[in-house]
Design a protein with these regions (language model features):
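Walker B catalytic acidic pair
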Residues: 141
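Active-site-proximal or metal-binding-adjacent scaffold patches in catalytic folds
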Residues: 1-135, 145-163
């Protein structure tokens, strides 16, 4: 009887943890919308102000700039190891808005597997960040993708200057 009760408690705990993980995930918090700028889908936070399309189009504009930069660097500096790494790992289809629960304003996950950006001036909403500021942040994240080391090392800062 005690082992059966323990089993029920354990099962309830596992289910609660799974529900918590789902509620904190991209799948629950983000809605994927097609951009009018480039026709690609971008996943953005569901906000009360209904500015989803503006957010998606902002991400599309910045992603297009990143694609041009990566293409230019690949064409003109393709023999450099850091540029090869950037060209190989940058995936414009993996750009999305950051979750409000994130402690970061932007990040690249696993050197390009996912790029996430905060698109608003305040963590839980506010007005959209301007395109030039978000482009600067995106260049910062591209520099992380092309850097072997993790963090803001000398290698990273040299790559950021290069970009």
């Amino acid at each position: 009887m005690k082992s059966q009760l323990f089993g029920y408690i354990l099962m309830a705990f596992v289910i609660a943890v799974c529900i918590k993980m789902f509620i904190d995930s991209d799948y629950y918090n983000l809605s994927c919308i097609v951009s009018t700028v480039d026709g690609n889908k971008y996943c953005v936070r569901v906000k009360d102000d209904l500015k989803h399309q503006e957010t998606v189009d902002l991400l599309a504009k910045v992603t297009n700039k990143c694609k041009k930069i990566v293409s230019y660097m690949g064409s003109n500096y393709g023999n450099r190891e850091n540029v090869k790494k950037l060209v190989k790992n940058f995936n414009p289809k993996k750009v999305k808005e950051i979750l409000p629960t994130s402690e970061f304003t932007a990040y690249s996950e696993n050197k390009g597997e996912k790029l996430a950006f905060c698109t608003t001036t305040q963590k839980n909403g506010g007005s959209l960040i301007d395109e030039n500021t978000l482009t600067f942040v995106a260049l910062h994240e591209l520099s992380h993708i092309m850097t072997k080391s993790i963090g803001h090392t000398d290698e990273f800062w040299n790559n950021f200057k290069f970009v």
